[in-house]
């Protein structure tokens, strides 16, 4: 993995992963909604790039465009952020195929969840991950040589302890029927999403 800092306020980092180049957006550069609730649509932008999904003109989907698309095509808009389930919904809708796969997290299976996430990252996938306190969506890009997660968050790429990151996970209800696309409480918006490229 190659991480490059760029002189670009909108996309301050670029990450090279094998044949993929991911621009890491800074959510504060894409309008009022994105400044307040943009972490989830930022994660969607990275996920769509990873899956090779671009717009007709060849440009990446930015946060403002994803937000406008989601309001139009993803049910239940209430003025709040997309949940992790909503991220899965909008990514697959834009992609026109299933590239995003949601997994629940009720807080009772941290060891197996960490093992599943680690396996998925080592298989070359990325993970959209919902944190608590504050509620925040990040993207797990990989595992470094010291065993830490490589995390895209707030327009930066940082490294974090795997155990520490799993402890930050938002916990909620299991089952697809209990999930909401737009934020309406932690019970209906927890878990993580595996993105396959």
Language model: regions and residue ranges:
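Active-site-adjacent structural segments surrounding the nucleophilic cysteine of cysteine proteases
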Residues: 1-78, 163-168
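Short, solvent-exposed mixed-charge patches
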Residues: 1, 196-197
């Amino acid at each position: 993995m190659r991480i490059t800092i760029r002189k670009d306020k909108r996309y301050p980092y670029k990450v090279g992963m094998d044949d993929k180049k991911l621009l890491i957006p800074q959510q504060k550069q894409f309008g009022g909604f994105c400044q307040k609730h943009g972490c989830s649509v930022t994660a969607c932008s990275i996920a769509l790039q990873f899956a090779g999904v671009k717009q007709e003109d060849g440009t990446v989907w930015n946060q403002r465009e994803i937000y406008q698309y989601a309001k139009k095509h993803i049910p239940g808009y209430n003025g709040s952020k997309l949940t992790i389930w909503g991220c899965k919904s909008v990514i697959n809708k834009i992609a026109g195929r299933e590239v995003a796969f949601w997994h629940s997290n009720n807080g009772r299976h941290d060891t197996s969840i960490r093992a599943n996430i680690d396996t998925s990252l080592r298989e070359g996938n990325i993970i959209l991950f919902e944190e608590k306190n504050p509620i925040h969506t990040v993207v797990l890009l990989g595992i470094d040589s010291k065993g830490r997660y490589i995390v895209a968050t707030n327009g930066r790429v940082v490294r974090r302890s795997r155990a520490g990151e799993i402890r930050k996970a938002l916990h909620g209800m299991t089952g697809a029927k209990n999930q909401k696309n737009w934020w309406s409480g932690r019970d209906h918006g927890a878990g993580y999403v595996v993105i396959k490229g």
